Amino acid sequence: MKIYKVDKTLVSTNRIAMMEHKPLLVVREKDGGTPQVAVDPVGCKPGDWVICCGSSAARDATGVKGYPSDLTIVGIIDKWEVPQDADTTS
Amino acid sequence: MKIYKVDKTLVSTNRIAMMEHKPLLVVREKDGGTPQVAVDPVGCKPGDWVICCGSSAARDATGVKGYPSDLTIVGIIDKWEVPQDADTTS
Amino acid sequence: MKIYKVDKTLVSTNRIAMMEHKPLLVVREKDGGTPQVAVDPVGCKPGDWVICCGSSAARDATGVKGYPSDLTIVGIIDKWEVPQDADTTS
Amino acid sequence: MKIYKVDKTLVSTNRIAMMEHKPLLVVREKDGGTPQVAVDPVGCKPGDWVICCGSSAARDATGVKGYPSDLTIVGIIDKWEVPQDADTTS
Amino acid sequence: MKIYKVDKTLVSTNRIAMMEHKPLLVVREKDGGTPQVAVDPVGCKPGDWVICCGSSAARDATGVKGYPSDLTIVGIIDKWEVPQDADTTS
């Protein structure tokens, strides 16, 4: 699993029907990193550091069998020290 | 899921039979980025910013059980601010 | 799916039995790029630009249930303009 | 499989229910490398060099059918010479 | 599939029970490249150039249903010319 910081909620105009039941969040490995989109079954808020599961396990981790996710939040980290190589400008 | 910009429709001379029922689009993570090919079950047009699902979930997300996709568009983003590190020259 | 150029046929001395029934081609994302090996159920020739499917979908895309592939050619592209960032020296 | 060095135990405030039964460790490919999170069914301690399995195989490797992992420790390496390109400052 | 050179046998002190029945080899994409660990159901020796299958197909390719592998050797290449960009110093 990788560690991401929650950036914000993602608003999409038109999703496939299978995706309609879960919030999608924009997450980044570090501030300024490439944005990715994760399914959030945990209930996170911007600024949280979270553990995300990818690969085929991301599907069941949503709690909905067969949900089409390749990145799902599976936990919130209590205290996370940003690694030295990460950007800490925000 | 990752975020891509739709570039154009991809025309292929000869596809395997399993792939014949869905449009294929060329998508890029940013203008000038490496082109990838995504299955489009949503109905996108060039210039749209879209959410794409990879891994094994890309298959069912096409809406056709067992479709051989490793990248499928699952949503169109309403408004997307291009991240600062992306190329915006086009 | 990603786009590759077919380089040549790959000859292997000793394959696992499950792999014996399909041709393997060396493909590259661009001239001079890292060589990868794709299963070819379509019938390609060197110089063709092809669409390759990875992940778990690469298996069924071979046309043989349970074939052990992680990269399978699923279509030949009619006309492909090499992106500007690609090496065109060959 | 890739080779990682165990850094420390990861404490998360709120995990999905499916993840509650196994310890999670922070692992890195080399000292100072990007931290990743692996499920540990073997029983490792900080400083151990371990083999981690990703992809869909990471799930069953936890020993719990359907566990939502994309990175699971599957073995401890007896003696591992750090490759020359790795950082050895710690 | 990717192409690797076999480096050496990997000795691990403690493996999960599911992994005990197959040899593990350290492989590299080129001399000096990052070491990875592949399951070897073919019978390779150090110096061999091999084809490795990843993703979910790596599991069945071991010949043991449900084996927890994400990288499995599926063939030995007869003659492999090292690409120009590879390090040939060893």
Curated annotation (Swiss-Prot), chains A, B, C, D, E:
Transmembrane helix recorded as keyword: no
Induction of the gene: Induced by growth in low levels of dissolved inorganic carbon (at protein level).
Keyword field contains DNA repair: no
One BP term from GO: carbon fixation
A GO cellular component annotation in the UniProt record: carboxysome
Keywords tagged on the record: Bacterial microcompartment, Carbon dioxide fixation, Carboxysome
Signal sequence bounds: none
All residue ranges annotated as the BMV domain in the record: 1-78
Cellular localization per UniProt: Carboxysome
Family matches, as PROSITE patterns: BMV
InterPro entries, sorted: CsoS4A (IPR014076), EutN_CcmL (IPR004992), EutN_CcmL_sf (IPR036677)
Listed CDD domains: EutN_CcmL (cd01614)
Quaternary structure, from the entry: Homopentamer.
Domain notes: The tight homopentamer forms a pore with an opening of about 3.5 Angstroms in diameter which is positively charged.
Role of this protein: Probably forms vertices in the carboxysome, a polyhedral inclusion where RuBisCO (ribulose bisphosphate carboxylase, cbbL-cbbS) is sequestered. Has been modeled to induce curvature upon insertion into an otherwise flat hexagonal layer of major carboxysome subunits.
Family: Belongs to the CcmL/EutN family. CsoS4 subfamily.
The name this protein goes by in its record: Carboxysome shell vertex protein CsoS4A
Organism listed in the record: Hydrogenovibrio crunogenus (strain DSM 25203 / XCL-2)
Gene: csoS4A
